[in-house]
């Protein structure tokens, strides 16, 4: 988009395929689908986040009940924080909150790693990474056609849909803050580093829990997590030092995780709705931040987690098709850029040869 003077929106990904027609009905339709996918993707995240925040608050202060009313109030509070960040802008609000978020996340992960079974975690990290890479193709295409299980719908398809719903806003937001970077830098900073961090995160927390169950006999952790998945992390912290402090930090971290997602998502939705304009009125950015909270609250009251999951999958399906087309557009754009670089190099060589001949 920046290189060719195009708007920073999803429609620009189709420019190598359909050219100026991205400014017509096709481009409008693509951006609308991206807006809906992002809106419901963030709303789903908020719905899941408040369930865990509510569980954490109940764990720290039992007088606070686990109830829809508390979760709706939590949605309002978190949305207010996101609204403040959006109004503050990219440099003052979003950037500072993102730095705080990463500091808390890394600190929490290092704490669990150091006080937990460190050697076991490192061994499991290497083994699980190898197992993941070995099984990724088979697991990706496994739809359990010959068995009957709710797992595939509640987890695999939901996570795929959730990821796809997040794709437009994450991609566009990272593109917005990565202007001037090379493709190599972009791939390294956006794909490689976060992937390694994700592997480490799941290994540290997941394998610490497995070590407690397998090696230290805390089998009750299994039934406690099965009874309420939202308190899984807090039940894990019961077996670690500084339980109350770590649990409080975790609640704060969950809040900042969502707020950073909501504020950046609001900026991207606002940009999409404005045709790729980077600077928009404050009230317009605030509108999208508030709407995300309203959608999350309505879906949570109407149908709980199942309603959130259903809307995520429904909105992600059409965008999955757009993503495939966008990948073809990216491939064609790189091919064109490659030919352009070769032509430029050839022109420079010819010019240099001509200058030497004249000399």
Question: Where are the model-predicted features located?
Answer:
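Helix-loop-helix connectors at the membrane interface of multi-pass transporters/channels
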Residues: 7-25, 49-73, 105-108, 172-181, ...
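Membrane-water interface regions at transmembrane-helix termini and the short interhelical loops
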Residues: 1-6, 55-62, 77-100, 116, ...
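Hydrophobic, membrane-embedded alpha-helices of multi-pass small-molecule transporters
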Residues: 1-2, 38-46, 70-78, 82-85, ...
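Transmembrane-helix bundle segments that line or gate the permeation/cavity pathway
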Residues: 1-59, 84, 113-116, 120-123
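Hydrophobic alpha-helical segments and their helix-loop junctions in multi-pass secondary transporters
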Residues: 43-61, 73, 106-143, 205-210, ...
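Loop-to-transmembrane helix boundary motifs in multi-pass membrane proteins
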Residues: 19-28, 66-83, 87, 156-165, ...
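Membrane-interface loop-to-helix entry segments
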Residues: 30-34, 38, 44, 54, ...
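Flexible loop linkers connecting adjacent transmembrane helices
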Residues: 2-25, 92, 212-238, 265-277, ...
């Amino acid at each position: 988009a920046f290189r060719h003077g195009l708007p920073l929106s999803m429609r620009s990904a189709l420019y190598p395929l359909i050219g100026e027609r991205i400014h017509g009905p096709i481009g409008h339709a693509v951006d609308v689908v991206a807006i809906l996918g992002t809106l419901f993707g963030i709303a789903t995240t908020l719905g899941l986040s408040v369930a865990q925040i509510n569980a954490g608050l109940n764990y720290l202060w039992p007088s606070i009940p686990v109830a829809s009313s508390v979760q709706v109030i939590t949605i309002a509070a978190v949305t207010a924080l996101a609204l403040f960040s959006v109004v503050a802008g990219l440099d003052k609000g979003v950037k500072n909150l993102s730095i705080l978020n990463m500091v808390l996340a890394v600190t929490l992960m290092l704490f669990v790693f150091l006080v937990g079974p460190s050697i076991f975690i490192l061994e499991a990290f290497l083994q699980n990474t190898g197992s993941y890479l070995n099984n990724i193709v088979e697991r990706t295409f496994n739809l359990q056609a010959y068995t009957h299980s709710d797992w595939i719908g509640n987890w695999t398809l939901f996570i795929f849909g959730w990821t796809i719903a997040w794709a437009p806003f994450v991609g566009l937001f990272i593109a917005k803050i990565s202007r001037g970077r090379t493709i190599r830098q972009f791939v390294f900073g956006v794909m490689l580093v976060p992937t390694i961090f994700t592997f480490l995160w799941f290994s540290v927390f997941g394998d610490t829990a497995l070590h407690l169950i397998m090696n230290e006999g805390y089998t009750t952790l299994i039934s406690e997590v099965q009874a309420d998945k939202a308190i899984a992390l807090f039940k894990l912290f019961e077996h670690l030092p500084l339980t109350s402090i770590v649990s409080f930090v975790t609640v704060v971290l969950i809040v900042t995780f969502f707020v950073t997602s909501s504020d950046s998502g609001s900026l991207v939705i606002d940009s999409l709705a404005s045709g790729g304009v980077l600077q928009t009125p404050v009230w317009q950015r605030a509108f999208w931040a508030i709407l995300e909270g309203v959608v999350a609250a309505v879906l949570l009251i109407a149908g709980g987690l199942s309603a959130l999951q259903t809307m995520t999958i429904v909105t992600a399906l059409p965008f999955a098709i757009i993503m495939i087309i966008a990948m073809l557009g990216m491939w064609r754009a790189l091919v064109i850029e490659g030919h352009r670089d070769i032509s430029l190099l050839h022109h420079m060589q010819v010019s240099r040869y001509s200058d030497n001949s004249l000399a």
